[in-house]
Protein backbone atom coordinates (compact mmCIF):
# COMPACT_ATOMS: atom_id res chain seq x y z
CA UNK A 1 0.00 0.00 0.00
CA UNK A 2 1.04 3.56 -0.62
CA UNK A 3 1.85 6.23 1.94
CA UNK A 4 -1.45 7.95 1.08
CA UNK A 5 -3.37 4.70 1.65
CA UNK A 6 -1.75 4.32 5.08
CA UNK A 7 -2.62 7.94 5.91
CA UNK A 8 -6.21 7.43 4.74
CA UNK A 9 -6.60 4.29 6.86
CA UNK A 10 -5.15 6.06 9.89
CA UNK A 11 -7.39 9.07 9.32
CA UNK A 12 -10.53 6.94 8.98
CA UNK A 13 -9.58 4.97 12.09
CA UNK A 14 -9.01 8.11 14.15
CA UNK A 15 -11.91 10.17 12.83
CA UNK A 16 -14.39 7.46 11.70
CA UNK A 17 -15.59 7.25 8.14
CA UNK A 18 -18.66 9.37 9.00
CA UNK A 19 -16.61 12.48 9.85
CA UNK A 20 -15.77 15.07 7.21
CA UNK A 21 -12.54 13.35 6.27
CA UNK A 22 -11.72 15.86 3.55
CA UNK A 23 -11.63 18.63 6.13
CA UNK A 24 -9.40 16.48 8.33
CA UNK A 25 -7.20 15.74 5.30
CA UNK A 26 -6.71 19.49 4.77
CA UNK A 27 -5.60 19.87 8.39
CA UNK A 28 -3.26 16.88 8.14
CA UNK A 29 -1.80 18.27 4.93
CA UNK A 30 -0.61 21.32 6.81
CA UNK A 31 0.49 19.47 9.94
CA UNK A 32 2.36 16.71 8.09
CA UNK A 33 3.65 18.96 5.28
CA UNK A 34 2.22 16.63 2.64
CA UNK A 35 3.23 17.15 -0.96
CA UNK A 36 0.54 18.03 -3.48
CA UNK A 37 0.81 14.56 -5.02
CA UNK A 38 0.36 12.73 -1.69
CA UNK A 39 -2.46 15.07 -0.65
CA UNK A 40 -4.37 14.55 -3.91
CA UNK A 41 -3.85 10.79 -3.67
CA UNK A 42 -5.12 10.89 -0.07
CA UNK A 43 -8.23 12.86 -1.07
CA UNK A 44 -8.90 10.46 -3.95
CA UNK A 45 -8.59 7.39 -1.72
CA UNK A 46 -10.90 8.96 0.87
CA UNK A 47 -13.48 9.77 -1.82
CA UNK A 48 -13.26 6.27 -3.27
CA UNK A 49 -13.64 4.78 0.21
CA UNK A 50 -16.85 6.76 0.71
CA UNK A 51 -18.13 5.69 -2.72
CA UNK A 52 -17.33 2.04 -2.00
CA UNK A 53 -19.59 2.23 1.05
CA UNK A 54 -22.44 3.15 -1.32
CA UNK A 55 -21.52 0.48 -3.89
CA UNK A 56 -24.92 -1.19 -4.24
CA UNK A 57 -26.65 2.15 -4.88
CA UNK A 58 -24.30 3.13 -7.72
CA UNK A 59 -24.98 2.51 -11.39
CA UNK A 60 -22.83 0.23 -13.50
CA UNK A 61 -20.98 3.13 -15.15
CA UNK A 62 -20.02 4.65 -11.78
CA UNK A 63 -18.97 1.25 -10.42
CA UNK A 64 -16.76 0.66 -13.46
CA UNK A 65 -15.20 4.13 -13.16
CA UNK A 66 -14.39 3.46 -9.50
CA UNK A 67 -12.99 -0.01 -10.20
CA UNK A 68 -10.83 1.33 -13.04
CA UNK A 69 -9.40 4.21 -11.01
CA UNK A 70 -5.73 4.14 -10.09
CA UNK A 71 -6.40 4.30 -6.36
CA UNK A 72 -9.28 1.85 -6.04
CA UNK A 73 -6.89 -0.79 -4.70
CA UNK A 74 -5.98 1.51 -1.80
CA UNK A 75 -9.61 2.18 -0.91
CA UNK A 76 -10.35 -1.55 -1.17
CA UNK A 77 -7.44 -2.35 1.15
CA UNK A 78 -8.96 -0.07 3.78
CA UNK A 79 -12.38 -1.62 3.27
CA UNK A 80 -10.90 -5.10 3.62
CA UNK A 81 -9.57 -4.15 7.05
CA UNK A 82 -12.85 -2.49 8.10
CA UNK A 83 -15.53 -4.72 6.61
CA UNK A 84 -14.38 -8.07 5.26
CA UNK A 85 -17.84 -9.10 4.02
CA UNK A 86 -18.33 -5.78 2.23
CA UNK A 87 -14.89 -6.08 0.68
CA UNK A 88 -15.61 -9.61 -0.60
CA UNK A 89 -18.95 -8.47 -2.03
CA UNK A 90 -17.39 -5.54 -3.90
CA UNK A 91 -14.38 -7.57 -5.07
CA UNK A 92 -16.75 -10.18 -6.55
CA UNK A 93 -18.78 -7.43 -8.22
CA UNK A 94 -15.62 -5.92 -9.72
CA UNK A 95 -14.56 -9.34 -11.02
CA UNK A 96 -17.97 -9.62 -12.69
CA UNK A 97 -17.68 -6.09 -14.16
CA UNK A 98 -14.22 -6.89 -15.54
CA UNK A 99 -15.81 -9.43 -17.88
CA UNK A 100 -17.37 -6.59 -19.89
CA UNK A 101 -14.39 -4.23 -19.54
CA UNK A 102 -13.87 -1.64 -16.83
CA UNK A 103 -12.46 1.11 -19.02
CA UNK A 104 -12.95 0.26 -22.69
CA UNK A 105 -11.70 2.53 -25.44
CA UNK A 106 -14.17 5.36 -26.12
CA UNK A 107 -16.22 4.77 -29.27
CA UNK A 108 -16.14 8.48 -30.17
CA UNK A 109 -14.10 11.59 -29.41
CA UNK A 110 -14.75 15.30 -29.47
CA UNK A 111 -13.18 15.37 -32.93
CA UNK A 112 -15.84 12.90 -34.13
CA UNK A 113 -18.59 15.15 -32.80
CA UNK A 114 -17.11 18.20 -34.52
CA UNK A 115 -16.89 16.25 -37.78
CA UNK A 116 -20.54 15.24 -37.33
CA UNK A 117 -21.48 18.93 -37.30
CA UNK A 118 -21.69 19.87 -33.64
CA UNK A 119 -20.37 23.37 -32.98
CA UNK A 120 -17.37 23.69 -30.67
CA UNK A 121 -18.64 24.30 -27.13
CA UNK A 122 -18.20 23.26 -23.53
CA UNK A 123 -21.24 20.99 -23.95
CA UNK A 124 -19.18 18.52 -25.99
CA UNK A 125 -17.39 17.31 -22.84
CA UNK A 126 -20.73 16.65 -21.12
CA UNK A 127 -22.02 14.83 -24.19
CA UNK A 128 -18.91 12.64 -24.33
CA UNK A 129 -19.26 11.76 -20.63
CA UNK A 130 -22.91 10.79 -21.13
CA UNK A 131 -22.01 8.66 -24.16
CA UNK A 132 -19.19 6.94 -22.29
CA UNK A 133 -21.50 6.24 -19.34
CA UNK A 134 -23.97 4.65 -21.77
CA UNK A 135 -21.10 2.64 -23.24
CA UNK A 136 -20.06 1.45 -19.77
CA UNK A 137 -23.68 0.55 -18.97
CA UNK A 138 -23.85 -1.49 -22.17
CA UNK A 139 -26.65 0.51 -23.82
CA UNK A 140 -24.28 1.82 -26.53
CA UNK A 141 -22.33 -0.96 -28.21
CA UNK A 142 -20.87 0.55 -31.39
CA UNK A 143 -19.41 3.73 -32.82
CA UNK A 144 -22.58 4.35 -34.85
CA UNK A 145 -24.80 3.97 -31.78
CA UNK A 146 -22.47 6.27 -29.86
CA UNK A 147 -22.71 9.00 -32.52
CA UNK A 148 -26.49 8.69 -32.68
CA UNK A 149 -26.77 8.79 -28.88
CA UNK A 150 -24.40 11.78 -28.75
CA UNK A 151 -26.59 13.75 -31.15
CA UNK A 152 -29.65 12.97 -29.03
CA UNK A 153 -27.87 13.99 -25.81
CA UNK A 154 -26.56 17.18 -27.44
CA UNK A 155 -30.10 18.09 -28.50
CA UNK A 156 -31.32 17.56 -24.92
CA UNK A 157 -28.54 19.81 -23.57
CA UNK A 158 -29.35 22.42 -26.20
CA UNK A 159 -33.09 22.34 -25.45
CA UNK A 160 -32.66 22.64 -21.68
Named regions from a protein language model:
Residues 1-160:
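C-terminal subdomains that position terminal phosphate/3'-OH groups for nucleotidyl transfer/ligation
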